[in-house]
Amino acid sequence: EMGKLLYMTDFEYCKYNFQAMRLNHLVIECNYCKELVDKTAENYTHRLKGHCSLDTCKILVKTNHTAALRTVTLVHLSNEAADPEQILKEIKEAVVWDDALVQIARPGLEVNLDLCPF
């Protein structure tokens, strides 16, 4: 059994709180770091309105974090406006339970979604 998984991508903000569900796995977009977004880019408004920032991702992780959380997999990072090392560091800081695995999705990544890892 894998438990409960929340998958969220292509959103600016999420007004819902899933903490009562005691999620086990988060697969969540972390598309850009605000300071890296090119304000003159043609897709500037779309990036802000149609994608999740690092700041929003951190809030969502903190808001929905419980001791049941086992994995946080970050997806849909921008090639131009994301710093994977910064994102990983800041999301790891948002996850207060040390045993939750935080990682960035890459081609070929396999994530163990078993509820019990043993």
Task: Identify the residue ranges that each predicted region occupies.
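Cap/insert and terminal regions of metallo-dependent hydrolase folds
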Residues: 19-107
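Core dinuclear metal-dependent hydrolase active-site scaffold
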Residues: 1-22, 113-118
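A short, charged, Gly/Pro-tolerant segment at domain boundaries
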Residues: 105-115
